[in-house]
Amino acid sequence: MGDVVPIVGSVRGFRWWRLSGAAELLSPWRGPVRWDPGENEASCLARRGMFGWKTSRAPHPNGCPSSRCECGFYALHGLPQLNDGLDRAIWEIDTASSGGRHGLVLGVAAGYGRVLIGTEGWRARFGKVLALFAGPLVTHHTRELGITAAAYNVPVYRDLDAFVQEWGPDRDELAELTA
């Protein structure tokens, strides 16, 4: 993450959410952090408490995210790739299983405000859910996913190519930001 380059607007990225069972999307790994419909503002969850992650006692001078911390809303520049090796990352889940028994759903988020761009993705102070994807053969959480999408006023795609074409990150913008 090199020099600070101001951009106007937002960046898009792919990310996973967990379906809550109550028409809510939760951050799947540092949770349960609920994403609201519309704008969400990140806070630093740098402290681990007895009952989960807690807000940091000392806010970062420049706000969330900080380059010296792991805070902020995360998203990937590209679709998660499967990797069966020992160095597998937690987000490397088969996209075809989105909305399946594990309760995770793939989507696209917009990030804006303070955004740190990395080689594989970004972290942002503000985030918004834009669209969701359910694997074409998935039937487990279909009703719940539809109710959740309606609550967030976002579309649900069953065709991965159409989902990426319509909502995926702008490749030209990414090339400039990661150069």
Language-model segments: which ranges?
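ADP-ribose/NAD+-binding catalytic cleft of ART/PARP-like enzymes
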Residues: 1-70, 75, 83, 87-97, ...
